[in-house]
Regions:
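Interfacial loop-to-helix junctions that mark the boundaries of transmembrane helices
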Residues: 4-14, 103-107, 201-209
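Transmembrane-helix bundle segments that line or gate the permeation/cavity pathway
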Residues: 51-136, 156-185, 193, 216
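N-terminal alpha-helical transmembrane segments of multi-pass membrane transport
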Residues: 1-73
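Single conserved hydrophobic/aromatic residue that forms the stacking wall/gate
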Residues: 209-219
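Alpha-helical membrane-interface segments at transmembrane helix boundaries
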Residues: 45, 107, 147-155
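A structural feature that tracks compact, well-ordered secondary-structure segments
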Residues: 188-189, 193, 198-201
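Membrane-water interface at loop-to-transmembrane-helix junctions
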Residues: 149-158, 204-208
Length: 219
């Protein structure tokens, strides 16, 4: 089993330190508004700002490691990951360190679950979430009584999400993938993103797929 945790650990430690320090700064500058009521306009700003800041800090591993030295390209690659778009600016994916490939797949895994959490937690506050549609369409008891608390829902979704990822990893290993490739493809597949660790994507493993025709016995 390949130990990809040993690559670029100082780069990722620096990225994490920058992100945590920036988070503390933002929290310190906004502590006076801790108990302020969030209005619809503030909600839009939080959603847009959250995506932008998440992508900006998510670009740091590419930039600091030198895997993608250009800010524009690193930002695009990270945004593509978090939004599970699947587009990439990389020509030779296999030349990247495996720790960077793992982070690249993880952006899609986080983004895939982030979309769900955004839908059930943020968008309803803006008046455009699923709860409004549920309230308008569902007869009988109110939606609040039928819908569990957001935190409980998020925990259950995360449990299902992680479980499916583990199960797919096991199946991909049984199909012939290495543990590293299986983990990465499970994270990207479960998020419907499409990032791969190979230049040919799943085509790299076509040699493992054997299609056999049933033998016909002559009468």
């Amino acid at each position: 089993m390949y130990d990809f945790s040993q690559e670029l650990h100082w780069d990722f430690l620096l990225c994490g330190s920058i992100t945590i320090f920036s988070g503390f700064l933002m929290r310190w500058f906004t502590k006076e508004h801790k108990n302020s009521e969030i209005k619809k306009r503030d909600g839009y700003l939080i959603v847009v700002g959250g995506w932008l800041f998440m992508t900006l800090f998510g670009s740091l591993p590419y930039l600091i490691s030198g895997s993608i030295p250009d800010l524009t390209n690193a930002f695009f690659e990270t945004m593509s990951g978090f939004t599970t778009t699947g587009s990439t600016i990389l020509d030779d994916i296999e030349s990247l360190p495996k720790s960077i490939l793992f982070w690249r797949s993880m952006t899609q895994w986080i983004g895939g679950m982030g979309i769900i959490v955004l839908t059930i937690a943020i968008l309803p506050l803006l008046g455009i979430g699923g709860m409004q549609l549920f309230s308008a369409e569902a007869p009988g008891p109110s939606a609040d009584k039928l819908h569990p608390r957001i935190t409980d829902t998020a925990k259950r979704l995360w449990l299902i999400y992680v479980s499916y990822t583990v199960i797919e990893t096991i199946f991909l290993q049984l199909a012939g993938m290495s543990f590293f490739d299986a983990v990465n493809h499970s994270m990207s597949n479960i998020a419907s993103g499409g990032f791969s660790t190979k230049n040919a994507s799943l085509g790299h493993w076509l040699s493992l797929i054997h299609i056999s025709e049933p033998t016909r016995q002559e009468a």
